[in-house]
């Protein structure tokens, strides 16, 4: 079974992906980890690779190809902003919540001010929206491709995991 989890920074995608991977006993493929691996292979910092990704689609395409290749080799939880668009999944999950909640989570996780996290999240989301539209003609704000959309501001980690597991069990 292939499950994709997408959502903006701070929405809880990694938390849900980790939880599903543990409960279901399947691997978790994180596009952020793929990005970090590419940076390490090229001897670049994450910031440097991010700037490079803004100059052309090559980096995004490498990540897409890696996810597709891993999906062909079996079941898993595939986490990433475009995972739902790139993979033929059995279940496509989108996590969302308000920017203020996400900024608060990011600030706590990365030990920075809420204002800084808010500013960085806005800038990142605007950059990603432009890139995805330009490179793929994807409107990242169009949620119509997702089977399940969960507002993680309404449920805690356990509640979000329970909702996702109920959807997965209903598929079988």
Curated annotation (Swiss-Prot):
Localization of this protein: Cytoplasm
Database matches in CDD domains: CMPK
EC class (word): transferase
GO cellular component: cytoplasm
GO biological process terms held by the UniProt record: pyrimidine nucleotide metabolic process
Pfam hit, one: Cytidylate_kin2
Reactions it catalyzes: CMP + ATP = CDP + ADP; dCMP + ATP = dCDP + ADP
Record key words, sorted: ATP-binding, Cytoplasm, Kinase, Nucleotide-binding, Transferase
Protein EC: 2.7.4.25
Binding positions for ATP per the UniProt entry: 7-15
One GO MF term attached to the UniProt entry: ATP binding
Similarity comment text for this entry: Belongs to the cytidylate kinase family. Type 2 subfamily.
Protein name per UniProt: Cytidylate kinase
Origin organism lineage: Archaea, Methanobacteriati, Methanobacteriota, Stenosarchaea group, Methanomicrobia
Gene label: cmk
């Amino acid at each position: 079974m292939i499950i994709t989890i997408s959502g903006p920074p701070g929405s809880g995608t990694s938390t849900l992906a980790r939880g599903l991977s543990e409960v279901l006993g399947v691997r978790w493929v994180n596009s952020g980890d793929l990005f970090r691996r590419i940076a390490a292979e090229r001897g670049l910092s994450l910031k440097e690779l991010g700037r490079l990704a803004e100059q052309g689609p090559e980096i995004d395409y490498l990540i897409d190809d890696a996810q597709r290749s891993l999906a062909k080799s079996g079941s898993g939880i595939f986490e990433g902003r475009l995972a739902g668009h790139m993979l033929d999944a059995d279940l496509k999950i989108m996590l969302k919540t308000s920017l203020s909640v996400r900024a608060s989570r990011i600030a706590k996780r990365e030990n920075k001010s809420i204002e800084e996290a808010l500013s960085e999240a806005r800038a990142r989301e605007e950059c990603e929206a432009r890139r995805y539209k330009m490179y793929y003609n994807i409107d990242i704000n169009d949620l119509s491709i997702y089977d399940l959309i969960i507002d993680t501001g309404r449920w805690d980690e356990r509640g979000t995991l329970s909702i996702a597991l109920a959807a997965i069990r209903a598929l079988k």
